[in-house]
Structure formats: C-alpha cells, structure tokens
C-alpha cells in the first residue's frame, strides 16, 4: 500500500480583517503605516485580508500588493467585492478573491465559548473580542493561539503556552504560567501594565516597547511580577 505524500483538505483559518470604506489609496497607506508604527509587534507576521464591500474608491491593486510586500505584511486576499470588473482587476494583480463564511468571522459573541475542548491542540486560531470592560479567559491558551482584546483589559486564569500571544489595548493579567508573548497598551497607551503570577514569557511589550526573554533579568523569571513602562523602557518589579 502506497503512502499518501500529498493530501488536499478544506480548512478554515482566521486573519486580521481591515475594512475599507470611503478612503483612497494614499490615505490608506498613511493610516496603516501609522498603525504599524504604534504596534509593530502586533502586525508582525499576521495574515491580513481586506474587506472592500463599502469601498467607494477604485484602487490600483498591483500597487496595493507591492505596498504590502514592501512593509513586510502578508496580504492573503480580498473579499466583499460586488463588481465583476473589480474582481477581474484584483485577480489580474495576482491577489486572490476570498469568500466569507459566518463561522470564520473574527467578531465572536462573548456568550459563546470560543475554545473547543475537543479541538486539536496544534490548531492555529485568533480571537478578537468585542469592546467591554474586561475579558476573562479560563481555558489554557495553546501554542499558536492569539487573543486580542481591543479597548479593554485581558484576564487569563490559566497557563499560556510557548508560541501563544496575548494582546490588549488595556492591561493584561495572567494568573498562571506565562510562556508566550504578552503585549499590553497595543494602541500606544504607556500607562498600561502586565501582571503575571509566573513569568517565563518569550516576549513582553507595552505600547510598542518590548523585552525578550533573553533581556529579562533572571531574578524575575518564574516569579510573580508587575511590568510597566518607565521613561519608555520596560520596568519589572516583584508583585507581592
């Protein structure tokens, strides 16, 4: 019996979706570059899709593709296009047309449990949380998972595996072993903090300023700490 070396299967992946409305290409470039400058780590290696359902301007799709490539972003495709002529222009540029499915949207209902206990632990996924005072996650955060809490605090009451990523515009609280990456103040708020009961993080960041595991003083590793930003530098102290 021959082994199957290549298998084709359907699968779903999540990505950061940018919604374009009444905006021209020049302004879009300026806006996106400003966002990246504020939160460079957040945008690093993240797949991006564009929703042009309400786009009033006609873009030069070849130039758009070149722009994304020049700044190191991964544009995986475009969806929401209604005009066949525009679809054809997009395809000619080498960009794929994506088709949206309800279960692949990034806006999850907060009453539903995003984490499936029976899911494959190697499944790569992202969770984008609607605005609320704070967001609580009790499940283990597995490698490859990314959780983003816009305009709020993120609270984790379990362990965070290596390769997992926590992002919040507010503070981040981790009541478990933190082995992944934590990025607080993602939109530039320098007053935000990271609280961790057991620090073993690959990377910690506040308002774009970051510190890797190699830069974290050994005395703070495996300890309960409070992380803040002082004079644009990461400051760590024991949290007793």
Curated annotation (Swiss-Prot):
InterPro entries xref list: CAP/MinC_C (IPR016098), MinC (IPR013033), MinC_C_sf (IPR036145), MinC_N (IPR007874), Septum_form_inhib_MinC_C (IPR005526)
Xref: Gene3D superfamilies: 2.160.20.70, 3.30.70.260
Top-level taxon in the UniProt lineage: Bacteria
GO biological process, one term: division septum assembly
Keywords: Cell cycle, Cell division, Septation
Pfam families in UniProt: MinC_C (PF03775), MinC_N (PF05209)
Coiled coil: none
Record bears the keyword Cell division: yes
HAMAP family in alphabetical order: MinC
Free-text function comment from the UniProt entry: Cell division inhibitor that blocks the formation of polar Z ring septums. Rapidly oscillates between the poles of the cell to destabilize FtsZ filaments that have formed before they mature into polar Z rings. Prevents FtsZ polymerization.
Record-stated family: Belongs to the MinC family.
Assembly, per entry: Interacts with MinD and FtsZ.
Listed PANTHER family: SEPTUM SITE-DETERMINING PROTEIN MINC
The protein, known as: Probable septum site-determining protein MinC
Organism: Buchnera aphidicola subsp. Cinara cedri (strain Cc)
